[in-house]
């Protein structure tokens, strides 16, 4: 019986049983690319320019924490963008709920230039100042990793994966493993700052280089 001829409660039940409309993710990906581009550009604005009359060579040497933090954050955002791109190769479309989750993912990404600047500016002020800065920095990246896991769980549970990925146990297992371990790894990286802040920063830099490694990407081409 057509819905308009049925009792109102039946129409309401049928509408609730229907899945969310799946639409193209093109605009979502374009918006996300813009956020990534802005965040990665803002990083350089926090590197201080030597003042006129200042010893430029000495000033540049003293700015090494800013340069190291910049490189680490630049590569980290590049890694996040790459993973975001690769995730969307197995996403067949988006829904209102998936849009909301993606917005939450972009929030800590847009925020990352701030903890990067805090780390660089307070590096020489003692461990009691640097450790909280590194915890904020690492916590921000860990939050990104957590939101990637939420996105993966949402997409896989709501039927948003393309048929090949949805039917591949290997892809699903790999996605579950990676998106489960990544938040833990970044939390441990942040905790390493309690031992030595430079160790924590090196861990984050090493992770970014590892994730971006061409050989690793080639070996895991089917990875979500």
Q: What positions do the PLM features span?
A:
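Multi-pass alpha-helical transmembrane bundle typical of ion/small-solute transporters
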Residues: 3-224
